[in-house]
């Protein structure tokens, strides 16, 4: 027997392999809440337009509420023979209310139905991700305020470059998360149009009101072209793109945590809450949470690439290939959610070794730029000349195995006679960070001000909901 939902044209049942490759309920069951919400909006609109009776619409709504409760409580049996979430819900609705259930699919196709469901799902993902990123920012800002003046090495090429503060470093990720949130919100704006009512691809001859269903589902408007409505997956791609960039940020931070917690570096320590041990080496404390964030974020990027490859060769309109749009995306979104929450936990948990940070900040002649700047300001030396002179002084200090501030003044003067003892005032890591007062710089006052500004902004967002 062929599938009773679409089998009027068929006289043979599908091959077992056909059933196996065609089924999607294992994945799209996660759309049940969105599917039921869209069906309720559709049924109400059909009744308002006089396409079905108010009595049928009422019974459909009650039946759908029952199904929603059954699934939520784990009492619903999903049947693989019914292929997908749409047919599973409709079949159960038929059991509950009888023939009236068959009227629900009037002026609707599974093509616009799944497009609507998935838009609602991705919209929910965006809202949840925004909330998670806000919590991540709040954790970063709190630690940045705490460590606005904690000196640490700033790096380029993973080499000590210039002293910065730990708070300044943390605020860099606040800015990244802000851009991530902006990208998700931009994607949400373009996503928030309703495909419902586009039917299979050409619209419908029934006098439906697509604006009413769009409003009921909190979309801004219905999509203007029925072909585009059922074949578009830009909303998933764009959200996965934003998710991938966000994942890169999480991975970069996770990598830093892995490096900083290494005993060879030892700038920070994670508590037992975010580390694991070894089955053979009793002494080990491994930063597995950070390492797993680094790995899981790759799944987000993989989901984006996978869907791009699925979509790149599809003519209009709906193709069955699009059934493969959900699993990778859902797994990618879940991986990002876990990564953000794990990073938030680690930010709250990590303990910087302030003494070690300060000592490391001065290694590698990190205040050499401060010396060059002093030569420019005090001796009116062109920067390129100052750069050259400083390089010679650094070489002299390295030759003697001493730090810049330990190099005798007379040896500096042997290279540049006009240097005075005042230069020693700019060669400490504390004076270096305090001098970086330009907007966006690492001076502790700047960092504290920026952190307070972010704290106010995030609190305002929280109150506005």
Curated annotation (Swiss-Prot):
Primary site of residence: cytoplasm
GO biological process: arginine biosynthetic process via ornithine; L-arginine biosynthetic process
EC number(s) recorded for this UniProt protein: 4.3.2.1
Protein's pathway: Amino-acid biosynthesis; L-arginine biosynthesis; L-arginine from L-ornithine and carbamoyl phosphate: step 3/3
Cellular component, GO annotation: cytosol
GO molecular function, one term: argininosuccinate lyase activity
Location in the cell: Cytoplasm
Entries under Pfam families matching the protein: ASL_C2, Lyase_1
UniProt xrefs under InterPro entries: Arg_succ_lyase_C, Argininosuccinate_lyase, Fumarase/histidase_N, Fumarate_lyase_CS, Fumarate_lyase_fam, Fumarate_lyase_N, L-Aspartase-like
Catalytic activity: 2-(N(omega)-L-arginino)succinate = fumarate + L-arginine
Keywords: Amino-acid biosynthesis, Arginine biosynthesis, Cytoplasm, Lyase
Broad class of enzyme this protein falls into: lyase
Family designation: Belongs to the lyase 1 family. Argininosuccinate lyase subfamily.
UniProt-recorded name of the protein: Argininosuccinate lyase
Record organism: Bradyrhizobium diazoefficiens (strain JCM 10833 / BCRC 13528 / IAM 13628 / NBRC 14792 / USDA 110)
């Amino acid at each position: 027997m062929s599938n009773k939902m679409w089998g009027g044209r068929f006289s043979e049942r599908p091959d077992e392999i056909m059933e196996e490759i065609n089924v999607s309920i294992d994945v799209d069951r996660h759309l049940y809440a969105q599917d039921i919400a869209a069906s309720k909006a559709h049924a109400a609109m059909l009744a308002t337009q006089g396409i079905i009776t108010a009595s049928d619409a009422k019974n459909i709504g009650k039946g759908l509420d029952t199904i929603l409760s059954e699934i939520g409580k784990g009492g619903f049996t999903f049947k693989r023979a019914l292929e997908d979430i749409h047919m599973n819900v409709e079949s159960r609705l038929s059991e509950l209310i009888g023939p009236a259930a068959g009227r629900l699919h009037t002026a609707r196709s599974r093509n616009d139905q799944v497009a609507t469901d998935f838009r609602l799902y991705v919209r929910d993902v965006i809202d949840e991700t925004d909330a998670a990123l806000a919590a991540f920012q709040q954790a970063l800002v709190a630690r940045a305020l705490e460590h606005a003046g904690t000196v640490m090495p700033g790096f380029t090429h993973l080499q000590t470059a210039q002293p910065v503060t730990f708070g300044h470093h943390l605020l860099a990720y606040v800015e990244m998360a802000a851009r991530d949130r902006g990208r998700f919100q931009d994607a949400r704006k373009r996503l928030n149009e309703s495909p419902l009512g586009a039917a299979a691809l050409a619209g419908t001859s029934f006098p439906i009101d697509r604006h009413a269903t769009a409003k009921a589902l909190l979309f801004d408007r219905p999509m203007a072209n029925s072909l585009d409505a059922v074949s578009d997956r830009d909303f998933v791609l764009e959200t996965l793109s934003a998710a991938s960039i966000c994942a890169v940020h999480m991975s970069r931070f996770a990598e830093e945590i892995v490096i900083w917690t290494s005993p060879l570096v030892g700038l920070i320590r994670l508590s037992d809450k975010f580390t694991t041990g070894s089955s053979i080496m009793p002494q080990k404390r491994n930063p597995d949470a950070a390492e797993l964030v680094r790995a899981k974020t790759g799944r987000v990027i993989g989901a984006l690439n996978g869907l791009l490859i699925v979509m790149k060769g599809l003519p209009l309109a709906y193709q069955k290939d699009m059934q493969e749009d959900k699993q990778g995306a859902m797994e990618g979104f879940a991986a990002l959610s876990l990564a953000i929450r794990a990073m938030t936990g680690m930010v709250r948990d990590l303990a910087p070794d302030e003494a070690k940070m300060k000592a490391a900040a001065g290694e590698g002649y990190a205040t050499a730029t401060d010396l060059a700047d002093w030569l420019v300001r005090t001796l009116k030396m062109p920067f390129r000349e100052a750069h050259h002179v400083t390089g010679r002084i650094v070489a002299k200090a390295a030759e003697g195995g001493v730090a810049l501030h330990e190099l005798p003044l007379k040896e500096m003067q042997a290279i540049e006679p006009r240097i005075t003892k005042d230069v020693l005032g700019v060669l400490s890591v504390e004076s270096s960070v305090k001098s970086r007062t330009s907007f966006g710089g690492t001076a502790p006052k700047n960092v504290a001000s920026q952190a307070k500004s972010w704290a106010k902004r995030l609190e305002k967002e929280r109150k506005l909901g």
